[in-house]
């Protein structure tokens, strides 16, 4: 389960975006953005196995796409965080910005927050207040039909292969680092055991050799 795609837009004008994996996100997002009214609103659209969550405030839309089994509370926590960071960074500039004007800067913020909110499953239990729970109850979920320009039914197509490859590389790197760390830990433990053994033998043998300088055992 993960947040698959996130976008910040003014109406249908995309200002910044980030995708967790490959897919026809932009084609689908354009259809969704065209259906979102300009007044302040929060809503979840349901389409197939995916959910489209959005917050619209001051004509700026903060939208993300998730699997249908991804917790809505986590999705809206993500959107609220993105909204706060975007408003703090750009303010009123977003009202007149050109398409993708903030993408070079803000896409990295989307990527970092997308990863953070996707991986931290305990986030809701820590951050979510009763007010947020009540707010979530008021956010409706609506089914939506998407139609491509050619009139055919539009489906969200996702290619997670690239992400799986990245995950495999990350897993191998993590495994190597873990093996290296375990090797160093075992080496340190071996050295400590050897030192302790030498000290122990020295303490045992010293009385038998007449003291700590071993006068009776060391020939002059």
UniProtKB/Swiss-Prot annotation:
- Which keywords label this protein? Acetylation, Coiled coil, Cytoplasmic vesicle, Endoplasmic reticulum, Endosome, Exocytosis, Golgi apparatus, Lysosome, Membrane, Phosphoprotein, Protein transport, Signal-anchor, Synapse, Synaptosome, Transmembrane, Transmembrane helix, Transport
What sequence ranges are listed for the domain v-SNARE coiled-coil homology? Answer: 125-185
Give yes or no: UniProt keyword Membrane. Answer: yes
Q: Which GO terms describe its biological process?
A: calcium-ion regulated exocytosis; endoplasmic reticulum to Golgi vesicle-mediated transport; endosome to lysosome transport; eosinophil degranulation; exocytosis; natural killer cell degranulation; neutrophil degranulation; phagocytosis, engulfment
Give the Cytoplasmic compartment stretches of this protein.
2-188
Q: Which residues cross the membrane?
A: 189-209
Provide any one GO MF term from the record: SNAP receptor activity
As for membrane topology, the entry says:
Single-pass type IV membrane protein
Q: Where in the cell is it found?
A: Cytoplasmic vesicle, Secretory vesicle membrane; Golgi apparatus, trans-Golgi network membrane; Late endosome membrane; Lysosome membrane
Q: What does this protein do?
A: Involved in the targeting and/or fusion of transport vesicles to their target membrane during transport of proteins from the early endosome to the lysosome. Required for heterotypic fusion of late endosomes with lysosomes and homotypic lysosomal fusion. Required for calcium regulated lysosomal exocytosis. Involved in the export of chylomicrons from the endoplasmic reticulum to the cis Golgi. Required for exocytosis of mediators during eosinophil and neutrophil degranulation, and target cell killing by natural killer cells.
- Name the UniProt record assigns to this protein: Vesicle-associated membrane protein 7
